[in-house]
Amino acid sequence: MSIQSGEILETVKMVADQNFDVRTITIGIDLHDCISTDIDVLNQNIYNKITTVGKDLVATAKYLSAKYGVPIVNQRISVTPIAQIAAASKADSYVSVAQTLDKAAKAIGVSFIGGFSALVQKGMSPSDEVLIRSIPEAMKTTDIVCSSINVGSTRAGINMDAVKLAGETIKRTAEITPEGFGCAKIVVFCNAVEDNPFMAGAFHGSGEADAVINVGVSGPGVVKAALENSDATTLTEVAEVVKKTAFKITRVGELIGREASKMLNIPFGILDLSLAPTPAVGDSVARILEEMGLSVCGTHGTTAALALLNDAVKKGGMMASGSVGGLSGAFIPVSEDEGMIAAAEAGVLTLDKLEAMTAVCSVGLDMIAVPGDTPAHTISGIIADEAAIGMINSKTTAVRIIPVTGKTVGDSVEFGGLLGYAPVMPVKEGSCEVFVNRGGRIPAPVQSMKN
């Protein structure tokens, strides 16, 4: 395959001018061989395994970044859901396990560690319940541990008892962490995937190898620049530009993943194609949608534009790699996207519109700040709505919502770094308390009649 000089310059520009980066190299680590009936032994086993398997990750990422001239922003670890690993200990709290994860992750220098998780789509074991009830204190006493709960799936339906508990857990976490920051590290899923390299929802699935490398790329700025510089007029042509750009982005991620796998002697798992924005100007998913012809993200037509973007990214990425997995689409985290922040501040991008957008994009209601006095049952209702979209449409959906204590609509909250800042958005006045308190399970949907 011949490479033109223009294509080489394009790749250089992607990094130099358009905020292209490999967002994360994540090592997934299986912890089943760490299980012990003694929680102290369990913690020591977990620490030893993480620090052994992950010891060279940061140095490898730095070497590859220098070798290829591509920034590798984060190095992360994901582990088997702790509710499964800690069950044999019969402990009444798993906060010490979260602290062990935090300590191990800091020892090897990674940015985040995920997997303080419970998979409860069909029911909660005593261990699942202990883990979920440990989340607020775990988020308060750790710095880089991320937590997730899978409350539903297309096969199992939605576990409304877990949804209720998740809402209460998020509310409690918001109350005991500064400006609700602990909630930025909690994701509630429907149809969670087992090979996600992105935080805060990463965990290492039970069907995975002992250790595996998953890579997440990011290039909203590259896609926007490609559209700006193209002469595409119809949406068919726009989709083609996005597809070709996604191909180029994916090839870089594939190269980095394969090289990291070889150097670390850990199998290469998947490449997640998700366009993950940052608060930096020029690195926004919202601005891509506006480049397609919307005056502001959130206006009518936004869901259609996002559907086009998401599908084109997947098509381009699939041609570039045989190892596409994870979430693979476009993320729409409000606080992490400069264009989304502006649209929300203008009052055009609302919670309702974001919910509609999640029906066609990669994940869900992400990094949304709501008033601190939002009741737990309202948070549970938002989670249930989002889970229903995922369940019916056979896709991953998720909620990462932050009730900010002491703040109300019109205020904003600063999270810093990649997490950015967010305007506090209004929630509905009506109550869903009776509905949420009913509990039980919303049955799995029929598959044969799709309307």
Swiss-Prot record:
Gene3D superfamilies: 3.20.70.20. Belongs to the UPF0210 family. It comes from Neisseria meningitidis serogroup C (strain 053442). InterPro entries: UPF0210 (IPR007841). Homodimer. The lineage of its organism: Bacteria, Pseudomonadati, Pseudomonadota, Betaproteobacteria, Neisseriales. Coiled coil: none annotated. It comes from the Bacteria. This is UPF0210 protein NMCC_1554.
